[in-house]
């Protein structure tokens, strides 16, 4: 299993600088999605950091049946293709069903397996057979060493281009906690590891018909993960989180991304010995 993974011009793993996966939880509309992507491109160019754009075309696991889910597969992939054409950023989005894999693989650089679905064998095998990079999010119900089974399922297809993402562990009701040892444990599985700091501060179902969150802790948990030596950070971002159609309570305000990322890059450089003497 390669400990370094290159996705377009973004490198995860080895002793490379921490990369960023960022974007809105869900595509609200085309203009909104493109505007966020352009701002993230500016951050990439100004800081010289690797950036992958993320956005969901369908949030199939929303708390409430009436919650906004997104534009759907066809329209969503069209928007994401436009993002790539206009910004050059590599793209990741989550897939929820085997039937989505073929179409998604035509547009996406990374196929993401949602945490709730990380044990779904058919989905993991289909994603692996696509030949695309597969980002498996660790289920909130799994120990980090149990991710070896998910890795083995994808690798059995001959595809060893795998990322693993930590996003917190269930802690009682409506809460998550992050065990930073998980990052080191999963790294031993031979795959680059990403830390999803925004979902880690989510309060699942904590608002009754939606999830709550504590976005004020995103930077603190990101600092801890970078200090451990994580290969990538995953942030859901939004220009106005309080008005976001999904996961606003745990999204990082878009205007804070550059400042917060600069701080993470400084810590990362020290941890990985990449500072200039």
Swiss-Prot record:
Annotated GO MF terms: 3-deoxy-8-phosphooctulonate synthase activity
Catalytic activity, EC: 2.5.1.55
Q: Which InterPro entries match?
A: Aldolase_TIM, DAHP1/KDSA, KDO8P_synthase
State the family it belongs to. Answer: Belongs to the KdsA family.
- Give me the segments passing through the membrane: none
Major enzyme class: transferase
Q: Which GO terms describe its biological process?
A: keto-3-deoxy-D-manno-octulosonic acid biosynthetic process
**What is the name of the protein in this document?**
2-dehydro-3-deoxyphosphooctonate aldolase
Subcellular compartments:
Cytoplasm
Among the Pfam families in the record, one is DAHP_synth_1
Organism this protein belongs to: Syntrophotalea carbinolica (strain DSM 2380 / NBRC 103641 / GraBd1)
The reaction(s) catalysed by this protein are: D-arabinose 5-phosphate + phosphoenolpyruvate + H2O = 3-deoxy-alpha-D-manno-2-octulosonate-8-phosphate + phosphate
Major place of residence: cytoplasm
Pathway(s): Carbohydrate biosynthesis; 3-deoxy-D-manno-octulosonate biosynthesis; 3-deoxy-D-manno-octulosonate from D-ribulose 5-phosphate: step 2/3; Bacterial outer membrane biogenesis; lipopolysaccharide biosynthesis
* Keyword field: Cytoplasm, Lipopolysaccharide biosynthesis, Transferase
Question: Quick one: a GO cellular component term?
Answer: cytoplasm
């Amino acid at each position: 299993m390669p400990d370094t993974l290159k996705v377009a011009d973004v490198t995860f793993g080895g002793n490379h600088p921490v990369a960023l996966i960022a974007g809105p939880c869900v595509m609200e509309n085309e203009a909104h999605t493109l505007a966020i992507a352009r701002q993230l491109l500016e951050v990439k160019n100004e800081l010289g950091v690797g950036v992958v754009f993320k956005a969901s075309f369908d949030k199939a696991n929303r708390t409430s049946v009436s919650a906004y889910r997104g534009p759907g597969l066809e329209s969503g992939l069209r928007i994401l293709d436009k993002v790539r054409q206009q910004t050059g950023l590599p793209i990741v989005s989550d897939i929820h069903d085997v039937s989505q894999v073929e179409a998604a693989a035509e547009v996406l650089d990374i196929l993401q397996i949602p945490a709730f679905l990380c044990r779904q064998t058919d989905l993991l095998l289909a994603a692996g057979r696509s030949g695309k990079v597969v980002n498996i999010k660790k289920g909130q119900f799994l120990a980090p060493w149990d991710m070896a089974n998910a890795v083995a399922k994808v690798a059995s297809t001959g595809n060893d281009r795998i990322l693993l993402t930590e996003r917190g562990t269930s802690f009682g009701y409506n809460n998550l906690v992050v065990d930073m040892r998980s990052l080191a444990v999963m790294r031993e599985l031979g795959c680059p590891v990403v830390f999803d700091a925004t979902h880690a501060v989510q309060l699942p179902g904590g608002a009754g018909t939606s999830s709550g969150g504590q976005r004020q802790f995103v930077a603190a948990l990101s600092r801890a993960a970078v200090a451990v030596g994580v290969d990538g950070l995953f942030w859901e971002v939004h220009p106005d989180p309080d008005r976001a159609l999904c996961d606003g309570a745990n999204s990082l305000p878009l205007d804070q991304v550059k400042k917060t990322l600069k701080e993470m890059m400084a810590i990362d450089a020290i941890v990985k010995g990449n500072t200039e003497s």
